């Protein structure tokens, strides 16, 4: 369990997989990050792709490969309000890529996501010695980009290739939205705090 200021992160389990998928691709906020008409380069992923080779494999829900990645439910007052994860398998040492989405629109704009990102970043710094966090949202998702910047992420003008292991550049270098549509946001964690 990871405690934030207003949310608690608990490891997601295999029993949570379907809910996590539904929150991402079949909720009232899906339109903010995936599928036509606004995101034609990021179609709604079918479950086999979402849980596939470069997606949320079982270890994100079992915790058995924490150096590669792991997922957490975001709880507020005991209620699941979203999902946050980190992935390291494809990145240079000392780095983690974060991803986050809320369960529904009613849980957006309340600080839950910001608090979850700060808490997870601090945990990664202390637990896995992660020093650099990365996020790759769509450049068109203004609300998400503002949230990420509010918690310390900054737009990088480096190529994503500089952060990826060579064997993943071709498959993952363009991000979920394609090279022209994917932002590259970076946050460097200090020795004292992730915030």
Residue spans for each PLM region:
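Conserved acetyl-CoA-binding loop-helix of GNAT-fold acetyltransferases
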Residues: 109-123, 146-150
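Terminal substrate-recognition subdomain of acyl/acetyltransferases
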Residues: 1, 166-195
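Acetyl-CoA-dependent GNAT
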Residues: 40-107, 188-190
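Conserved acetyl-CoA-binding loop of GNAT-fold acetyltransferases
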Residues: 149-159
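A short, well-structured alpha-helix characteristic of acyl/acetyltransferase catalytic modules
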Residues: 1-50, 191-195
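Conserved beta-strand-loop-alpha-helix junction that forms the acyl-donor binding cleft
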Residues: 135-145, 161-166
């Amino acid at each position: 369990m990871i405690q934030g200021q207003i949310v608690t992160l608990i490891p997601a389990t295999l029993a949570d997989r379907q809910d996590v998928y539904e929150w991402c691709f079949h909720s009232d906020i899906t339109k903010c990050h995936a599928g036509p008409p606004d995101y034609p380069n990021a179609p709604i992923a079918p479950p086999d792709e979402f849980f596939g080779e470069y997606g949320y494999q079982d270890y994100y829900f079992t915790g058995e490969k924490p150096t590669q990645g792991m997922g957490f439910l975001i709880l507020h007052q005991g209620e699941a309000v979203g999902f946050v994860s980190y992935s390291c398998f494809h990145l240079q040492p000392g780095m983690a890529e974060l991803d986050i989405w809320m369960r529904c629109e009613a849980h957006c704009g309340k600080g839950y996501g910001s608090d979850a990102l700060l808490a997870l970043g601090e945990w990664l710094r202390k637990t896995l010695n992660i020093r650099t966090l990365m996020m790759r949202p769509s450049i068109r998702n203004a609300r998400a980009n503002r949230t990420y910047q509010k918690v310390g992420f900054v737009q990088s003008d480096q190529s994503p290739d500089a952060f990826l292991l060579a064997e993943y550049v071709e498959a993952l270098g363009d991000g979920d939205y394609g090279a022209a549509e994917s932002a590259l946001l970076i946050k460097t964690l200090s020795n004292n705090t992730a915030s």
